[in-house]
Amino acid sequence: MFNAGRYQELENWTRLLLERCPKSGFSWKVLGVTLQAQGKDALTALQKAAEFLPEDAQAHYNFGVALQHLGHHDRAVASYRRALEIKADYVEAHCNLGVALKELGHLDEAVTSYRRALEIIPDLATVHSNLGNALKDLGQLDDSVVSCLRALEINPDSAEAHNNLGITLMALGQLDNAVASYCRALEIDPDYAEAHNNLGITLRALGQLDNAVASYRRALEIRPDDTDTLISLGVALQDLGQLDNALTCFRRALEISPDFLKAYSNLLFLHNYKIAHPAATLLEEKRRYGNLAARQARPYTEWHNVAESEKCLRVGLVSGDLRNHPVGFFVEGVLAALASNYSGRLEFIAYPTHSCVDTLTERIKACCHGWHSAVGIPDENLARRIREDGIDILIDLSGHTALNRLPLFAWKPAPVQASWLGYFATTGVAAMDYLIADPWTVPESEDIYFTERVWRLPETRLCFTPPEVEIDVLPAPSLSNGCVTFGCFNNLTKINETVVALWAQVLQAVPRSRLFLKAKQLQEASERQRLLELFASHGIHGDQLLLEGSAPRADYLAAYQRVDIALDPFPFPGGTTSVECLWMGVPVLTLEGNSFLSRQGVGIMNNAGLPDWIAADTNDYLAKAIAHASDLPRLATLRSGLRDQVLTSPLFDAPRFARHFEAALRGMWAQWCNQQQGEPSMCTMVSKNGSSFGR
């Protein structure tokens, strides 16, 4: 009857049998698979089958499948393992055990299960594909490619295998090859929503924003309520400056899944681009996020860490950006200095949330005592791992940026937790003890807008690693062409209409001047046209504008040789771009804002020794732009010595920054140790080098 599809009839028959023999394991087993075939709840029947047939491997396997479909992966693992105790060569059990283990974040064990299945039957395409996926999450990208290609040798028409290969190729930075893999998957299965979404993600990385948006919209036609795709679409629209449309996507994702913290993070990050948002309002938004994260966590209140203030501290780093990324550029030199000068005092253990491994990743990894992929590991499991690793201080390097794991911090896996570097506002997470800042970006009067205690490093929260590429600082271009070239290489989303209006006044006030803009969005003809029209509405025509798309880092840095003065956008100023600009000998005119983020330029320029390049308001910004552009000899002199000036400044002095940073970590740890010994926690503590914190 089962093979004939007569499921209802078979169900009725087995129920009659069970009325007569309620302990018949075989009848419960038949009923369970029959209910499964009809899409009905089969859990109880399959559980009873496993109970009454304790030595039946298939009964335990079937129960595991039912548990797995309901998301009970831990219980499914137990059932599969029982099946394998009975029948060690049960291939399906090995395969599904691998899937369940991967869902739980036990990637090494998942790989072992997949490999065991392949030892028994080597030509299982799906298992090779799943193995490749798990290896990708572990950061073993070359091995992942091998597994995906093996899956495709066995089954060239596996859309899933092509999709998985594309994901790994993207992590390797082979974007064009990744696009080809996704396109092949979509040739096989045009309605493969995940492949459309992944294609969009890769196209966005290539700067093809319009095509990326089209891919996301196609994915949403297939699966309208897919929250991950809604986030992807929102981020691409944000890149295109369509902030209201992006906001709609993030809010729609939250309507579908009110507890979707990733959507909430994207919504909060978007606010950074908007001018009119009072600090108190943003704080309340962040608190709501923090409350939601707290409701999803069961925070630890006890740890096994020894409360000794001078012990060697185990410091955990959670980030998706320990690679060729601005965070990587800042953290590399700092970690190298800390590893060199504080060996035996500090140990760094990284928990990367991204599979990408590049040359910068390898250099950062060399500074760490441990490296454990956090990709695909649920917060609860990762929190347990971090606690078991004995991490004393856990540092978030992402805030509400992409690939963050802020919800993890709500579990409080370490006794001391801090946010630093990758973000520029409060996280809103109550379990985050500290936010590392400096006196320029967060004056003491602003402490009330943070859920964390603000710990101020004495000079700067940023220390940049000089680029490895050898690029000379050339004489100011205005000396040879007779016109001042202003420039901005920031993300184009930062350049709002208020910024354009002010820059238009600058161009109108400085004769024969022009503006050089370089950003990934400018690879799109539609974006170039939009920007030309926006400037035209403020009286600036195309012959005063030079628009270029993104470029490899060496070419991007060399482009500064064509810029005399950099103009900082607002309220979201440059960070990495500003420091790189200074390294290339180009001063940056920045506007002082009223928030942590909008004062980032203030901190950079003061630490660079250029306070006269900080404008108090838009009128001062215009006046300073005119004044600096009118004194070309002074500008040329400044340019010739600026690289040497900043290389000896706090912005590039890694050993100096490392001293301040180690003292800050030691101070945070001392506070916790004091609390464990029953001593009152001080409201303000000043270390011997001047680091301080307050509420």
Predicted stretch roles:
Residues A350-C356, R514-Q529:
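Glycosyltransferase donor-sugar binding loop
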Residues L502-A509:
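Hinge/capping helix and adjacent helix->loop/strand transition within the periplasmic-binding protein
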Residues N491-L492, E592-N594:
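Short coil/turn segments
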Residues V318, F489-N490, K518, E548:
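Short hydrophobic "strand-cap" motifs at the C-terminus of beta-strands
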Residues G487-T498:
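Substrate-binding clefts and catalytic carboxylate motifs of secreted carbohydrate-active enzymes
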Residues M1-C483, A501, L532-H541, L546, ...:
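Alpha-helical solenoid repeat scaffolds of the TPR/TPR-like class and their adjacent stem/linker regions
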